[in-house]
Amino acid sequence: MADERIGDYVKTRYDIALMNLNDIKIAVFRDSLSTYVEQKTGLTIQFNWPKSRCLVISTLCKIPFPTKSAAELQEMCSLLLCCPERLQLLGYVSAWGKETRDVCLTKTLVFVGEDERFYGLDFVNETLYLLAETTERFAVLGLRRYDPVYREKDIRFLTKIDDVLQSLIDVQDNLWKFATIVYKNSGRHYIMKSCLENNDGVFVLFLTRKEDFPSRMEWNFFSDVYESMPYHGHVIGSIGKTLLYPKTMFVMMDLSGAIYGIDTIGTGIGSCVKIADEFESFLRQGIVRGYRRYKFFHQNISTVQEILPLCPHTFLGPTFSNDYIYDLSSEDEE
């Protein structure tokens, strides 16, 4: 009964977010978003996730932290996009439940692009993230695709942090020390609570060397790709629905500590995409930024990506079913 009440509450919060965002959808359709923003400046919309954050509708002059001019912001975003797209300022991200809206835990601006695409701009680090491809998906996802939010300590981990994981977090900026700990704990597995899917994922720690790969046909494609990867790093584990092959994704760490996901579903290797800034963030966000987790895929983007793409579109894979996101999780209500 308690689970049903929690589920109803999460669904209600999603409905409220969607109801408020639908006004934005209509404004975009009518090409009157600037008018909507001027009229609704100060309106707060609580995100479906995380519930401790909200979107504050705001014109540029009302943003509570120093920014740039409208032309300079558009130029910045244009440099971060792989294709021409007109972005319009919608507002900024703030803490939910504050009497004033000048509490900005991250200096984040929210833009609306063409075809209802929602973007989050990390103004400090000048990084643009594609938050959602449609209004409905934005109502569901909230800030799940926005990496900086996972640096906040109030975002809970998807798995219980034991001594091994804590030791890995402590050395997450040193790949060699990190790899040593992984090697000593090879085969250790953790259940990572899924936020957006029916089944939880299983994260398994291991280091890979080509000579250690099983002599099975399904590993051949990965063995060849791993040998020719154009950067320095280690595969530190995998994520799948069970402990058995096939896995959903291999997890890799590079020399800077960033985490990448290498898709393994299908007949060949998928894109190697950055899924987290660091290991600690990865344990909070899982693979929500992984290959096959996006719907939008620009026609000019190759399926083979650069290792550090600037454009948020280059994180994406081809169009897949988006049914998985509608199993609204109560993970942040427990």
UniProtKB/Swiss-Prot annotation:
<comment type="similarity">
    <text>Belongs to the herpesviridae US22 family.</text>
</comment>
<protein>
    <recommendedName>
        <fullName>Protein U17</fullName>
    </recommendedName>
</protein>
<dbReference type="InterPro" id="IPR003360">
    <property type="entry name" value="US22-like"/>
</dbReference>
<dbReference type="Pfam" id="PF02393">
    <property type="entry name" value="US22"/>
</dbReference>
